[in-house]
From Swiss-Prot:
Superkingdom of this protein's organism: Bacteria
Sorted UniProt keywords: ATP-binding, Ligase, Nucleotide-binding, Protein biosynthesis
HAMAP family xrefs: GatB (MF_00121)
Name recorded for this polypeptide: Aspartyl/glutamyl-tRNA(Asn/Gln) amidotransferase subunit B
EC number: 6.3.5.-
Catalytically driven reaction(s): L-glutamyl-tRNA(Gln) + L-glutamine + ATP + H2O = L-glutaminyl-tRNA(Gln) + L-glutamate + ADP + phosphate + H(+); L-aspartyl-tRNA(Asn) + L-glutamine + ATP + H2O = L-asparaginyl-tRNA(Asn) + L-glutamate + ADP + phosphate + 2 H(+)
BP GO terms, sorted: glutaminyl-tRNAGln biosynthesis via transamidation; translation
Presence of keyword Ligase: yes
PROSITE patterns given in the database record: GATB
Tagged with keyword Ligase: yes
Summary of the function given for this chain in its UniProt record: Allows the formation of correctly charged Asn-tRNA(Asn) or Gln-tRNA(Gln) through the transamidation of misacylated Asp-tRNA(Asn) or Glu-tRNA(Gln) in organisms which lack either or both of asparaginyl-tRNA or glutaminyl-tRNA synthetases. The reaction takes place in the presence of glutamine and ATP through an activated phospho-Asp-tRNA(Asn) or phospho-Glu-tRNA(Gln).
Gene that encodes it: gatB
Amino acid sequence: MSAVYADWESVIGLEVHVELNTASKLFSSALNRFGDEPNTNISTVCTGLPGSLPVLNQSAVEKAVLFGCAVEGEISLLSRFDRKSYFYPDSPRNFQITQFEHPIIRGGRIKAIVQGEERYFELAQTHIEDDAGMLKHFGEFAGVDYNRAGVPLIEIVSKPCMFCPEDAVAYATSLVSLLDYIGISDCNMEEGSIRFDVNVSVRPKGSPELRNKVEIKNMNSFAFMAQALEAEKQRQIDEYLNQPNKDPKLVIPAATYRWDPEKKKTVLMRLKESAEDYKYFPEPDLPTLQLTESYIERIRKTLPELPYDKYHRYIQEYGLSEDIASILISDKNIATFFEVACKDCKNFRSLSNWVTVEFGGRCKTLGVKLPSSGIFPEGVAQLVNAIDQGVITGKIAKEIADLMMESPGKNPEEILKEKPELLPMSDEGELQKIIAEVVLANPESIVDYKNGKTKALGFLVGQIMKRTAGKAPPKRVNELLLLELDKG
């Protein structure tokens, strides 16, 4: 990047729409289920038929409150719904029911690890609203599927507290992880159950001003989010540099863009509307939502251990590195897998490496998730225990791991019974003979070892393991090698 760009910084905030996994829609009994035939999960309410009246889904409120507890937000005892008026084919009522003036949650924060540093990203508010339908295009024609219309959402609005793409991605991934842990949404980006809108402006470094922001709609991957933010930052800086004497508000008008991944650029969709354009007013068909402290406290008590807390526990209780702990807690199912394995294996550091690196890497290559791969936590624990007990070597363990991936459900003991040739060599006489031959063939390494160069010992061990195809027990190799060297 040019040195000119280095004098500027981005100011980033996110608006995240999260579909809640309730059984029915927000204001009607129509099913909330993705993938059904178009326009089969609809009602008079979500299609806006005259005379239909909304009834608030209690489960959606509980899930919103649970999120508020998880982010340590201020949960309003009194909140209210408003109508946001706009015309679009996917909104048959020509308005959305949302919370504009009095949201259910104010404030809160998302805890994240950014490049090894603990960070807190502040939230402005979280409110409940219903989703719109979906336009589906068929050549020159378009149809509308109202199955999604009326699906309950929470919209999570952050403060403009991020200053680079890495911040935004860390915030987004940490938010998804938190939502997964508390179980209020499946957060399936491909199905649209979580959608990210990114607001970004730029300013000279050190300046406190907030200039006009541009919204980039519907980021459906974290990689695209990072790319779009970087490209938009450069576009805005170029505009300001090319028009240095112009009012900044006129240089970058508030607008909505989309990301074009093929052209690697943001593309203008429309200029921004103001709040007045939406003609917000209180929803006349819904009463004020009233909560009690005891209701909130009852929901708070159902919170599970959250990712950030689990991260610190893994470091303190299991002695894991920050990097490994961060990988484990990023996925609730992986964390659960690891904790189940910990019941049968107490070498937590080695176990965490096998879960994240060895089996995690194999699963990534095959395009599967570890918890659904057919590998069981007990099997991984058994494998690590076998290494620690000298039953197998690390090299053989990797071969067994490959076989476990090929034969889902089989544990190391079963594989070793079927393939006894994988067991380490048990003929100590043969091993002593190989050690003597290696020592005889490497006189320079013997001299180095005698002169205190410890690397020479590692070299000799490596030669022995090579001669035995990795089947010699490393611990016993070291013992016998030292005995052989002491003879001289």
